[in-house]
Amino acid sequence: MPSSSGIDAAIRLREMTAADLDPVLAVRLSTHENAITRQELEEDYGITTEGLARDMKTHIRGWLCEVDGRVAGFSMGDASNGEVQVVAVHPDFEGCGIGRRVLAAVCDWLFAEGHARIWLAANPDLDIRATGFYEKLGWRRNGAMKGEDEILVLVKPSPR
């Protein structure tokens, strides 16, 4: 992993295109916590590169961070329902602020789309760091579940 002190200058945040789908899915498949296979993505969630490319033309958008041309992490959201669908960071870049950056980009977009409240589903297992990460950023559990995942919500900050 690059040193976190020198990585900030090398990080490039940009909006995803359909051409980025294979590299971002490779990042999602590389994660150790909440691991998943391509077959599980397709069979359990109906997620394919073709389907995502189609949805990116209408209601799905995503942002990624690159470091030296390599996809380090990404996040995607759904404007039709205010959901942050995924946040994933390659293990080589964990702890470098990548997840926070891509999540902020998606949240900003969803709020700009008119959602006063956005949501995501996270594994409630306390051994998985995701829920703590989200709570540290202001997300709150609401007690609802989506399958085996717990729903967390973020309310749009009031203008100052």
What role is predicted for each listed range?
Residues 66-68, 154-158:
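Active-site beta-strand termini and strand-to-loop segments that position acidic
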Residues 110-123:
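Conserved GNAT acetyl-CoA-binding A-motif
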Residues 120-131, 146-151:
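Conserved beta-strand-loop-alpha-helix junction that forms the acyl-donor binding cleft
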